[in-house]
């Protein structure tokens, strides 16, 4: 493919993408395929001679699209949103064209410097404490990670290195292995599974702190666990507080647990993967109060801020905590500016070496929507979730399971878990809308998350009518 054909095919691809997005409402949100459907539809080996672009596009529609779960359908209410916008798509095209691997300033100065500026833009939108920003006189800064899972792991590994160095400085006879077996990290029992995975990868004990009646971590439960573990000779060193849990969008109490972590010299990492986007709205900023106690903070613009995956924003108060844990300087990666104090080499802030020009997406989206446009988008989703909540509350057969704060509604039929499992099975088998469940204590609960950029009140109303019809069928079957 030469440049001339690329221009032509590029226009065709943009048309295909635009048609897909405009017509997505007409596609069944969840596919009809079974596991293994795709292999019989494509050759067993790559072609020896080139295929045509027309053949490939035809196969996309015939082979790929039938197996796609349409996350951007206005009838997709599962998981949490994944962001999608035309400005971000355009930026991704440009990112692919530039094709740099921005592991250092020298590898691509623009890639590095735009990321630094965009992370400061975003930090200011959130009104983060200045300690997290990449200001000349400060020690903090921001970096784009691939996911919140990655950010949690990076924070845990940095905290682990920091505590080992601190203890060995005080007691040089201590080995790393001796320290490691005593380290213990904490999170709420509502924290995302990626926190547990970070503990497994980091080789440290992770303990779940029981949450309160609102599914939030509180000071008393944390303090009790710390005292018990210290008495047993363990070394508390790391804690993850969640703002907007995956199960029910509950919020750990940072104003309570933050001071405890600071007093006990425990690294506090705040995971706001979903909810963080809402903090750009003044009416939701109070949910972030207490972040001043954190050592690191993370949320995903690729969830709810119209920046396509992957783009997970992470800030630290002391960037040397990351670079001290991950810095390696082989000769082939060195450059003349690396010790100048004027530049950032992001390879020292992350687990991989390579990194894409992800800040382009942020730059395009922030400029083409503006802060006001992004705020309006968040507010619309929250309004739609409250609309759905109101519909549920009007039906005496159903109950709301936890306070609706942002764009997630947790609800269920009053009664047994069995009847709710049957309802969810009917909903997802019908494939008109898509939901996923969670467990809140011993209750099986349905999650209704406002996800699509194009979802409107009419889609929420239709979804509720559909749920009510299926609920009537389930209750009728139970009586029979």
From Swiss-Prot:
Q: Which PANTHER family match?
A: AROMATIC-L-AMINO-ACID DECARBOXYLASE, GROUP II PYRIDOXAL-5-PHOSPHATE DECARBOXYLASE
Question: What does the sequence similarity comment in the record state about its family?
Answer: Belongs to the group II decarboxylase family.
Listed under subunit, the entry gives: Homodimer.
Gene3D superfamilies (alphabetical): Aspartate Aminotransferase, domain 1 (3.90.1150.10), dopa decarboxylase, N-terminal domain (1.20.1340.10), Type I PLP-dependent aspartate aminotransferase-like (Major domain) (3.40.640.10)
Q: Does the keyword Ribonucleoprotein apply?
A: no
Q: Which residues bind substrate?
A: 82, 192
- For the keyword Acetylation, the answer is yes
Instruction: Give its E.C. classification number.
Output: 4.1.1.28
The metabolic or biological pathway listed in the UniProt record of this protein is:
Catecholamine biosynthesis; dopamine biosynthesis; dopamine from L-tyrosine: step 2/2
- Kindly provide the name given to this protein in its UniProt entry: Aromatic-L-amino-acid decarboxylase
């Amino acid at each position: 493919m030469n440049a001339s054909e690329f221009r032509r095919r590029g226009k065709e691809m943009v048309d295909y993408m635009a048609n897909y997005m405009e017509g997505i409402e007409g596609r069944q949100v969840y596919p009809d395929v079974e596991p293994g459907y795709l292999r019989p539809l494509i050759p067993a080996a790559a072609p020896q001679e080139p295929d045509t672009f027309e053949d490939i596009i035809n196969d996309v529609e015939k082979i790929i699209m039938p197996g796609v779960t349409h996350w951007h359908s206005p009838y997709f209410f599962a998981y949490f949103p994944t962001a999608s916008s035309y400005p971000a798509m355009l930026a991704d095209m440009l990112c692919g064209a530039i094709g740099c691997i921005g592991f250092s300033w020298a590898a691509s100065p623009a890639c590095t410097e735009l990321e630094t500026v965009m992370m400061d833009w975003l930090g200011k939108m959130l009104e983060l404490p200045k300690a997290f920003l990449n200001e000349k006189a400060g020690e903090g800064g921001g970096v784009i990670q691939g996911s919140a899972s990655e950010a949690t792991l990076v924070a845990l590994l940095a905290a682990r290195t920091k505590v080992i160095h601190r203890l060995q400085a005080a007691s040089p006879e201590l080995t790393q292995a001796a320290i490691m077996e005593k380290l213990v990290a904490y999170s709420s029992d509502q924290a995302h599974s990626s926190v547990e995975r970070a503990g497994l990868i980091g080789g440290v004990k992770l303990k779940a702190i029981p949450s309160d009646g609102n599914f939030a971590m509180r000071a008393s439960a944390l303090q009790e666990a710390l005292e018990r573990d210290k008495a047993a000779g363990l070394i508390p060193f790391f804690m993850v507080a969640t703002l907007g849990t995956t199960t029910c969008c509950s919020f750990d109490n940072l104003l309570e647990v933050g001071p405890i972590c600071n007093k006990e010299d425990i690294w506090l990492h705040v995971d706001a993967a979903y909810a963080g986007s809402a903090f750009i709205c003044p009416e939701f900023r109070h949910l972030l109060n207490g972040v001043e106690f954190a050592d690191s903070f993370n949320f995903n613009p690729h969830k709810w801020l119209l920046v396509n995956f992957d783009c997970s924003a992470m800030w630290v108060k002391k960037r040397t905590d990351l670079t001290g844990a991950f810095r390696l300087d082989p000769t082939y990666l060195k450059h003349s500016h690396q010790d100048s104090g004027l530049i950032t080499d992001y390879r020292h802030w992350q687990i991989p070496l390579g990194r894409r020009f992800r800040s382009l997406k942020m730059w395009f989206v922030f400029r083409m929507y503006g802060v006001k446009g992004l705020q309006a988008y968040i507010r619309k989703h929250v309004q739609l979730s409250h609309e759905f909540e109101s519909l549920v509350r009007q039906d005496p057969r159903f109950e709301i399971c936890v306070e609706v704060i942002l764009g997630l509604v947790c609800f269920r039929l009053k009664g047994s878990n069995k009847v709710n499992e049957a309802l969810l099975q009917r909903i997802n088998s019908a494939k008109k809308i898509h939901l996923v469940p969670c467990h809140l204590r011993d209750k099986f609960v349905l999650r209704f998350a406002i996800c699509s950029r194009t979802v409107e009140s009419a889609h929420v109303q239709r979804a509720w009518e559909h749920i009510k019809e299926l609920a009537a069928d389930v209750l009728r079957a139970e009586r029979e």
